[in-house]
Regions:
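Phosphate/pyrophosphate-binding loops at sites that engage ATP/ADP/AMP, CoA/4′-phosphopantetheine
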Residues: 1-10, 90, 161
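Active-site neighborhood for divalent-cation/phosphate handling
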Residues: 10-112
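Glycine-rich phosphate-binding loop plus the immediately following alpha-helix
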Residues: 78-104, 137-174
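Gly/Thr-rich phosphate-binding beta-strand-loop-beta motif of the actin/hexokinase/Hsp70
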Residues: 1, 10-16, 66, 109-141, ...
């Protein structure tokens, strides 16, 4: 059941962090002219999927006289294409697509001063997303194929209680 009314056809979409790749890396300042090529080279070295099968984006997040620090994000084309097809079929226009942990990071950076490094751990039902923010920018992301459901099952087994009771214990006691 929907609460309220959707008044805009433009939407932002988050992709599961487990389906995306994000990484920061440093390059000599002279490389900035060929930044796109350097980012693709980094993707080829770091990501186990050919760069031709990825949508890759990047942002310079830090600059000194000698070097630049770049944040690269990449998602398999098939993942993005399927999402866009579904969203457009529903009558919406995607204007932003980003890893879900990046969305959480942006919210935290907007609400915090960002002066201390921060670790974000987003525990979902089936997976856990992790990001490290430093100076208001995501530096590293990762994910685990373990989420809240795993914890609930473990509690149920260890305490020999029903899943519903295990879930309540997890929520109430952490």
């Amino acid at each position: 059941k929907m609460i309220g009314e959707v008044t805009s056809k433009q939407i932002a979409i988050s992709v599961p962090t487990a389906r995306s790749f994000s990484r920061t890396f440093t390059l000599p300042i002279a490389t900035e002219k060929a930044l796109h090529d350097a980012v693709v080279l980094e993707a080829d070295q770091y990501i186990p999927i050919p760069s031709t099968s990825l949508y890759i984006d990047h942002q310079v997040i830090e600059r000194t006289k000698q070097e630049i620090t770049v944040l690269m994000s990449a998602v398999p084309r098939v993942v993005i294409d399927n999402i866009v097809t579904t969203v457009e079929a529903a009558g919406f226009q995607p204007i932003l697509i980003e890893p879900s942990i990046s969305s959480v990071g942006r919210v935290l950076t907007a609400t915090e001063e960002g002066s201390l490094p921060t670790v974000i751990v987003d525990i979902g039902p089936a997976s856990t997303d992790i990001a490290i923010l430093d100076r208001g920018t995501i530096r590293v992301t990762g994910g685990l194929a373990i989420g809240g459901n795993t914890f609930t099952l473990d509690i149920a087994k260890k305490l020999n209680v029903a899943l519903e009771n295990a879930h309540q214990l997890k929520v109430l006691n952490g």
